[in-house]
A protein has these predicted regions:
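Short, charged recognition helix plus adjacent turn
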Residues: 72-108
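DNA major-groove recognition helix of helix-turn-helix/homeodomain DNA-binding modules
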Residues: 35, 54-69
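Short alpha-helical DNA-recognition segment
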Residues: 24-43
Length: 129
């Protein structure tokens, strides 16, 4: 098993960040459209906070894309990461989750997010073209 793990939430954040940048939208503008502070939005995009289903729909609306298009991009990215075998993709354990408490973090690998995850995804996208 790989040492490095990524969460579904951090993948969603990177997918959203890439789409936002592609459209030339600043974080603060998208945050405002979603009814969030720029700091709260930044935590979502970096994977430090998790998107709620409501926020995912609001984000898609603010980006001017269908929610299923956003979800499809996340699923494709997850599949590409799994195929690369460079990282393991899984739900990030929650502090109050029974599994997280029982494992005590001993066998939980390093979650990567933010710029490192973005670079990995961009690298994989370049290989698939």
């Amino acid at each position: 098993m790989q040492d490095k793990m990524v969460s579904y939430s951090s993948i969603l954040g990177v997918v959203v960040a890439n789409k936002r940048k592609e459209l030339g939208i600043e974080q603060s503008v998208l945050a405002e459209k979603m009814g969030l502070s720029q700091a709260s939005y930044s935590r979502l995009e970096s994977g430090k906070s998790t998107f709620s289903v409501d926020q995912m729909f609001e984000c898609a609306k603010a980006l001017g894309i269908a929610p299923d298009e956003l979800f499809h991009s996340v699923v494709n990215t997850v599949n590409n990461l799994k195929e690369s075998e460079q990282v393991s993709v899984q739900a990030q354990p929650r502090g109050n989750a029974t599994k997280a408490k029982s494992e005590g973090g001993s066998n939980v690998g390093t979650f990567i997010a933010g710029a490192a995850l973005g670079a990995l995804i961009i690298g994989l996208a370049g290989k698939s073209k």
